[in-house]
Every structure is written in C-alpha cells, then in structure tokens.
C-alpha cells in the first residue's frame, strides 16, 4: 500500500513557515544570489567534510542545523568556521546578510528551512545511519549523504533516480559538489529528480484509507 511518509513530507511542505530571518541571511550585498547548502541533522564527522569545502567557495552560503545542539557541539562547529557565522539565537536582523553561515541552534525549524536551499546535505551517514532525506527532497533539490544509507529504501531510490548521492569521504564530496556548483543543468536535473521522486510516491495514505473502507 505504499509509504505514508511521502504524504507526510508533502503535508509538511504545504504547512512550511515563511522564515524572514532566513530570507534576510540569504540577501547578498552584490545582489548576486548565493548558492545555499542546508546541512540537516549534521554530526561532527559530516561537518569535517562540508565545512572545509564551504571555506573554499565564497559563492556559497551555509545553513547548519546540527543533530545535537548542546554547547560543546556548537562550540566545535564555531571553532571550525573561518567565514562570518552566527547562531540563530544570537542573530540580529541588521547584520544577518553579512554572515556566510547560519547555525540553527533550536529544534523544529529544519523542515521549513530546506525550502531556502539549492543543495541539501543530510547528516548521520558516517554514524548509525542517515537522517530524513525526504524532508529535503520534497523541495526539489539534490540530497547528499554519507555511506550508511542502506537501511533506508527511500535513500536507495533517490540514488537510483539521480536525486540522491552517497559520498564516502572528503574527495567524493568535493567531486559531487564541484559538479553541482559548476553545472547548472546537473543541479537542476538532480533537484527535479528528487522532487519528482517524492511527488510520484505520494498517495499511500489515500490508498490505505480506501482499503480500510472497502473492508
């Protein structure tokens, strides 16, 4: 009867909040829109891969929503960052646009934040297993994640349709990111594939309800 999680992420997308502070953060002084990567549910092993790449790419802005937001983790992220960054809890609207990285140190916003990205990185793939890929894919963007994804059918399916990409280390991450940043067609095609995958998978809830009704 299908997977009701697809219906759920579509519902979440419909209810996603407008987040003025994110819009402000994404404003660029030069009027050139940055390429935004949203790193959702990240762990230290993930951050060690995407933060150095972010440092080398001034055309990028980065939103990090760490899986754990305790003090030590936030401090370790800040210690790695060499570009202007700010925690959401300490952000001021008047200088948000000057920051290159926004650290989301509160829960409950991630599913609404993905809408502002062009690329998503989903954490957990270097630990026990990746977190929710569908929350990002529903917005039609390519989804990158570490090697531990095999327990998750939707991640395997995303890879199969060309909307998801598993990276195994710093080098494979760089190769895929270089492609997405330099080839607008690759970025658009993979994002479209991810979004279509979710759209084409919805309907399970209706199906289940119909079956219950028939019985």
Residue ranges and their predicted role:
Residues 1-215:
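Nucleotide-activated sugar donor-binding and catalytic core shared by glycosyltransferases
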């Amino acid at each position: 009867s299908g997977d009701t999680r697809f219906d759920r992420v579509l519902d979440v997308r419909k209810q996603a909040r407008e987040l003025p502070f994110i819009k402000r953060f994404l404003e660029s002084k030069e009027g050139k829109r940055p390429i935004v990567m949203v790193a959702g549910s990240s762990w230290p092993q993930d951050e060690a891969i995407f933060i150095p790449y972010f440092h080398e790419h001034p055309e990028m802005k980065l939103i990090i929503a760490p899986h754990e937001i305790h003090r030590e983790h936030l401090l370790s992220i800040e210690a790695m960052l060499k570009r202007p960054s700010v925690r959401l809890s300490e952000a001021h609207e008047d200088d948000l646009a000057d920051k290159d990285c926004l650290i989301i140190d509160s829960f409950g916003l991630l599913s609404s934040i993905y809408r502002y990205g062009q690329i998503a990185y989903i954490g957990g793939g270097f630990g026990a297993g990746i977190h929710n890929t569908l929350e990002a894919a529903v917005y039609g963007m390519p989804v990158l994640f570490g090697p531990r994804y095999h327990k998750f059918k939707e991640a395997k399916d995303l890879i199969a349709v060309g909307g998801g990409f598993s990276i195994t280390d710093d080098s494979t991450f760089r190769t895929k990111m270089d492609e997405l940043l330099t080839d607008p067609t690759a970025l658009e095609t993979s994002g479209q594939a991810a979004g279509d995958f979710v759209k084409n998978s919805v309907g399970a809830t209706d199906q289940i309800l119909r079956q219950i009704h028939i019985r």
